[in-house]
C-alpha cells in the first residue's frame, strides 16, 4: 500500500486542496449572524436592525443599530452630500468623450516630416532624391504656410483663373511662384472687394459658360460688355471689334 500523496509509479503528488464549500458557508454565517436583530432589552423592544447595547450608565439599556447597518448609513449620507459633485463629474466625462469622438484633434506632423501626398523639395544642388533631404519644414500654423494655402485656394476664383488662361499659362501657378504683393492681395487680412470699374466689364455666368466651349481664337465678347478692355488701352482693336481675353 502507498501512503497519501504517492501514486503507484512512485511519484509524489500534492494533496487535494480542502473543499471551498464549507469555507463559503462559514463566511456567510459570519456575515449574517451579526446582522440579526430584534428581540428585547429588558423592557425595550428593539427593531429588526437593532440590538441591545450598553450605555455609559450601567443601569440604562437602549437599542442601537448593528455595526454593518450603521456603516452603510454613514456611506449613504456621504454619497448624498457629494451627489451633486458626482453628477457634474459624470456629465463632464460624458461631454469630454463625445467631443473627442465628434471633433478629433488635428494630426500634427513634427518638423522635417512631410504631410501625406506632399513631397518635400530636395537640396538646391540636386544631391539625393526629393523628399529625403532639405531644410526642416515649419509648423503647420506658421504665417508663411498659411499665406501659401490662402494663395493656392484663391486661384479657384474667376479672376485668377481667367488671368492665367489669358496669359497662355494653361494652368495654375504654384504657391512658390506667387509674389509677395499677390500674397498680400489674396490674404484675408488684406482682402478688399473690387470696385465697380474693375468688374463691370466681366461677363455673366451664362456668357462665361459659353466662352469656355470656344477656342481662344474664336472668343469675342458680346456687345453688352464691349468697352475698354481690362488691362489694355482704348485704341487696341482688331477690325473694329475689341477682343477680350478669356475670363
From Swiss-Prot:
Protein name (Swiss-Prot/TrEMBL): Uncharacterized membrane protein C3orf80 homolog
Keywords: Membrane, Signal, Transmembrane, Transmembrane helix
Signal peptide: 1-35
Major location category of this protein: membrane
Membrane-protein topology: Single-pass membrane protein
Keyword Amino-acid biosynthesis assigned: no
PANTHER family listed in its UniProt record: HYPOTHETICAL PROTEIN LOC100362176 (PTHR38505), RIKEN CDNA 1110032F04 GENE (PTHR38505:SF1)
Species name: Mus musculus (Mouse)
Listed GO CC annotations: membrane
Bias kind Low complexity: ranges: 111-120
Bilayer-spanning residue ranges: 82-102
Amino acid at each position: 500500500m502507498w501512503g497519501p500523496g504517492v501514486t503507484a509509479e512512485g511519484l509524489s503528488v500534492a494533496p487535494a486542496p480542502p473543499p471551498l464549500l464549507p469555507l463559503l458557508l462559514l463566511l456567510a454565517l459570519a456575515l449574517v449572524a451579526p446582522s440579526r436583530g430584534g428581540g428585547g432589552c429588558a423592557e425595550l423592544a428593539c427593531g429588526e436592525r437593532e440590538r441591545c447595547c450598553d450605555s455609559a450608565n450601567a443601569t440604562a439599556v437602549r437599542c442601537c443599530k448593528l455595526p454593518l447597518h450603521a456603516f452603510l448609513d454613514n456611506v449613504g449620507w456621504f454619497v448624498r452630500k457629494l451627489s451633486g459633485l458626482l453628477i457634474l463629474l459624470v456629465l463632464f466625462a460624458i461631454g469630454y468623450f463625445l467631443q473627442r469622438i465628434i471633433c478629433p484633434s488635428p494630426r500634427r506632423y513634427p518638423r522635417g516630416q512631410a504631410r501625406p501626398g506632399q513631397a518635400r523639395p530636395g537640396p538646391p544642388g540636386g544631391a539625393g532624391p526629393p523628399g529625403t533631404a532639405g531644410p526642416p519644414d515649419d509648423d503647420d500654423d506658421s504665417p508663411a504656410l498659411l499665406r501659401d494655402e490662402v494663395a493656392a485656394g484663391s486661384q479657384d476664383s474667376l479672376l485668377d483663373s481667367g488671368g492665367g488662361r489669358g496669359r497662355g499659362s494653361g494652368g495654375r501657378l504654384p504657391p512658390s511662384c506667387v509674389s509677395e504683393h499677390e500674397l498680400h492681395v489674396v490674404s484675408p487680412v488684406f482682402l478688399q472687394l473690387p470696385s465697380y470699374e474693375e468688374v463691370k466689364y466681366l461677363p455673366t455666368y451664362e456668357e462665361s459658360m459659353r466662352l469656355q466651349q470656344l477656342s481662344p481664337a474664336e472668343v469675342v465678347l458680346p456687345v453688352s460688355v464691349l468697352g475698354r478692355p481690362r488691362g489694355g488701352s482704348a485704341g487696341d482693336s482688331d477690325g473694329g471689334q475689341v477682343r477680350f481675353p478669356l475670363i
